[in-house]
Swiss-Prot record:
The keyword Amino-acid biosynthesis applies. The gene is hisC. Its EC number is 2.6.1.9. GO terms for biological process: L-histidine biosynthetic process. One of its GO terms (molecular function) is pyridoxal phosphate binding. CDD domains: AAT_like. Keywords: Amino-acid biosynthesis, Aminotransferase, Histidine biosynthesis, Pyridoxal phosphate, Transferase. It comes from the Bacteria. It comes from Xylella fastidiosa (strain Temecula1 / ATCC 700964). The modification N6-(pyridoxal phosphate)lysine is found at residue 220. InterPro entries: Aminotransferase_I/II_large, HisP_aminotrans, PyrdxlP-dep_Trfase, PyrdxlP-dep_Trfase_major, PyrdxlP-dep_Trfase_small. Belongs to the class-II pyridoxal-phosphate-dependent aminotransferase family. Histidinol-phosphate aminotransferase subfamily. This is Histidinol-phosphate aminotransferase.
Length: 365
């Protein structure tokens, strides 16, 4: 191993660096035509009409792994497939952070699972708030670097585009963080909404920064949220460690099959068209919302959603709810006491949302 690889593995908990994990029946490379090694049923379930569900699934299906690597621009051995990005977050925290010792750094207001996983691991949580100014929310890069160095954080989570605020971090700023924290922390960039963004993916930076980790998912742009397929893209040696910490059979066969179909050339073509439509609708919706008298601010977004501040967020939420429109209440989040997050829907759905909010304006106070 080279010095860089040693540095990456040095960030893993010492007792897990040589941890063998569980050796499942499917993890052993064997061939044969009569499989009696996993105590599976010799008969299919009556509900299994195609008789394909009685065997345990591949832990990391090679075909899907190759398809995801091609999609994200990396090598198959740099991809760990898991149950959504949530599993990747949890695996990283458990593999890297010693309880009560190794901090996790987050940038609120932000996706809550980073903090949840840190708390479950009893890892100290360092919070560096996003800055809200005339241009919108943005990451405070100098403060992130200072806090990470001072606290000796082992994991730095950067959500880009950020949920719920919609801001993406420029690649140059992420590279500055990577350069400064080399050898001391894994820098995890969550690109769950990357397909909707003008900012390119950071995956190519992995060639220069082995302590970079990227999270991707099929839940958003690819419309496969129920399939629960997420990817951790990282140094191959780190991926191998995370795999040994993962459950033996994390990926149900039906989910793998749907994911493979969803990544076909034809499906990817449709996805690209829908992403373009969502981006266009996002800007239409943003402009229309900004014209409503009860709206204080509509933030620019690189995701498939908009963060909106209201004069009376409770009234807006309740009016939408009464009309059958459910949006995400963000008022409990730091800095967002008056904000709702609105997912960009179809043109018809967005028009319906706007109609309800316009009706609020028409009602006398």
């Amino acid at each position: 191993m080279n010095a860089q690889t040693h540095t990456v593995l040095d960030l893993v908990r010492q007792e897990l660096r040589s941890f063998a994990g569980y050796s499942s029946a499917r993890s052993v490379a064997l061939t044969g035509d009569l499989w009696l090694n996993a105590n599976e049923s010799a008969w299919p379930n009556p509900a299994d009409s195609h008789a394909t569900m009685r065997r345990y699934p591949e832990p990391q299906p090679p075909k899907l792994r190759q398809m995801l690597a091609a999609l994200y621009g990396c090598l198959p051995e740099q991809v760990l497939i898991g149950r959504g990005s949530d599993e990747g977050i949890d695996l990283l925290v458990r593999a890297v952070c010693e309880p009560r010792r190794d901090p996790v750094l987050v940038t609120p207001p932000v996706f809550g699972m980073y903090a949840v996983s840190a708390q479950l691991q009893n890892a100290p949580l360092i919070q560096v708030p996003l800055v809200d100014d005339a241009a919108g929310f943005h990451a405070d890069v100098p403060a992130i670097i200072t806090a990470a160095q001072t606290s000796r954080a082992k994991l730095v989570f950067l959500c880009s585009p950020s949920n719920p605020v919609g801001a993406a971090i420029p690649l140059q700023q992420i590279e500055t963080i990577l350069q400064t924290l080399a050898g001391t922390a894994l820098v995890v960039v969550d690109e769950a909404y990357g397909e909707f963004s003008d900012v390119p993916s950071v995956v190519p930076l992995l060639a220069r920064y082995p302590h970079l980790v990227v999270l991707r998912t099929l839940s958003k742009a690819h419309a496969l949220a129920a399939v629960r397929i997420g990817s951790v893209i990282a140094d191959a040696h780190l991926v191998a460690v995370l795999r040994r910490c993962q459950a033996p059979y994390p990926l149900p066969t039906p989910c793998v099959s749907l994911a493979e179909q969803g990544l076909s050339a034809a499906a990817l073509h449709v996805t690209a068209q829908r992403v373009a439509e969502i981006r266009a609708e996002r800007e239409r919706l943003r402009a229309a919302l900004a014209c409503l008298s009860g709206v204080r601010r509509v933030y620019p977004s690189q995701g498939n959603f908009l963060l909106v501040r209201f004069d009376d967020a409770e009234a807006a939420f309740q009016a939408l709810y009464a009309a059958g429109v459910v949006v995400r209440d963000q008022r409990a989040a730091p800095q967002l006491h008056d904000a709702l997050r609105l997912t960009v829907g179809t043109p018809e759905q967005n028009t319906r949302l706007l109609a309800v909010l316009r009706d609020i304006q028409a009602v006398p106070a």
